[in-house]
């Protein structure tokens, strides 16, 4: 039986909120089978638990934001992406601010944190959402689509007309049947443009943003002194984001995802459209491990590798 997973022990880290610029303490705790991934604002009295679900995503302008009863947890996509990449089904995420810390702008720190805690199987079957017919969302020239596929693969195209981005490639495809999340996706950093950062700071946002946690571009070049971690790091980060955005559906997807200029909002709209059509998906488990898609086999996890 392909089993659910959680972490073995509590693990904690401290980082900076991308928009607030304030110190954030993040604590990850094991959770029982069937719990899902639950975020808790422990700084509130009483504390507010917000399960990671597609319907709980509210604001998507700058990040994926979970909301409940006036409480918010922002920028959850990188941690959710790491959980998807490591096959974590159940986890308590305690945070003492309204943002998950940005760390280095990728999912690598969260992968390290989860692996440091240890990953263990639980006595319940891992549940998957298998897409059974195409689901598509369009918004102008933007597209996000899910198709039936016995595995998990993603294809993403961006369109940023900038010299530094143009020369790195604007399309990337990955199939986790034969590719490692930790090697090929987890280290891709978020990116932004210097003039946009200044505009955000003028309205009290991006106070924690720096060259230490993002790739920053001016009109002509990359301002960071270090090299890109991947030749096409920009589009790979969009795939990292998409994996995290899609994981709030509640279970790993057995599907092919295709996107053109998609973002957090369109990705969430795609999940809502999927869940609204009961004929578009089914919940499945695998009693025999060898019958599961290769991307999710034990030898490819934790970390799809």
Curated annotation (Swiss-Prot):
Gene Ontology CC entries for this record: membrane
UniProt EC number: 3.5.1.108
Enzyme class, UniProt record, top EC level: hydrolase
UniProt key word Zinc: yes
Gene Ontology biological-process annotations: lipid A biosynthetic process
Binding site for Zn(2+): 78, 237, 241
Active-site feature positions: 264 (proton donor)
Signal peptide: none
SUPFAM superfamilies: Ribosomal protein S5 domain 2-like
Functional summary from the UniProt entry: Catalyzes the hydrolysis of UDP-3-O-myristoyl-N-acetylglucosamine to form UDP-3-O-myristoylglucosamine and acetate, the committed step in lipid A biosynthesis.
Listed name of the protein: UDP-3-O-acyl-N-acetylglucosamine deacetylase
Lineage: Bacteria, Pseudomonadati, Pseudomonadota, Betaproteobacteria, Burkholderiales
Gene field: lpxC
């Amino acid at each position: 039986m392909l089993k659910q997973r959680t972490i073995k022990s509590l693990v904690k880290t401290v980082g900076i909120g991308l928009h607030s610029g304030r110190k954030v303490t993040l604590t990850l705790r094991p959770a029982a089978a069937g719990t899902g991934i639950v975020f808790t604002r422990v700084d509130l009295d009483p504390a507010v638990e917000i399960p990671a679900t597609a319907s709980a995503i509210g604001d998507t302008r700058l990040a994926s934001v979970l909301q409940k009863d006036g409480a918010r947890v922002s920028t959850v996509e990188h941690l959710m992406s790491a959980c998807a990449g490591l096959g974590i089904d159940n986890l308590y995420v305690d945070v003492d601010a309204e943002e998950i810390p940005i760390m280095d702008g990728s999912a690598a720190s969260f992968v390290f944190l989860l692996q440091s805690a240890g990953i263990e199987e639980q006595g319940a079957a891992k549940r998957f959402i298998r897409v059974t017919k195409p689901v598509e969302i369009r918004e102008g020239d933007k597209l996000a689509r899910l198709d039936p596929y016995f595995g998990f693969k993603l294809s993403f195209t961006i369109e940023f007309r900038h010299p530094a981005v143009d020369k790195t490639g604007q399309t990337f495809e990955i199939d986790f049947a034969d590719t490692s999340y930790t090697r090929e996706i987890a280290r891709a950093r978020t990116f932004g443009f210097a003039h946009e950062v200044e505009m955000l700071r003028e309205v009290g946002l991006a106070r924690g943003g720096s060259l230490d946690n993002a790739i920053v571009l001016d009109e002509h070049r990359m301002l960071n002194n270090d090299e890109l971690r991947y030749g096409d790091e920009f589009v790979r980060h969009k795939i990292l984001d998409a994996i995290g955005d899609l994981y709030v559906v509640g279970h790993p997807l057995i599907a092919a995802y295709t996107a053109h200029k998609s973002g957090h909002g369109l990705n969430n709209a795609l999940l809502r459209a999927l869940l609204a059509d009961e004929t578009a998906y089914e919940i499945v488990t695998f009693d025999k491990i060898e019958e599961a898609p290769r991307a999710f086999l034990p030898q490819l996890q934790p970390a799809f590798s």
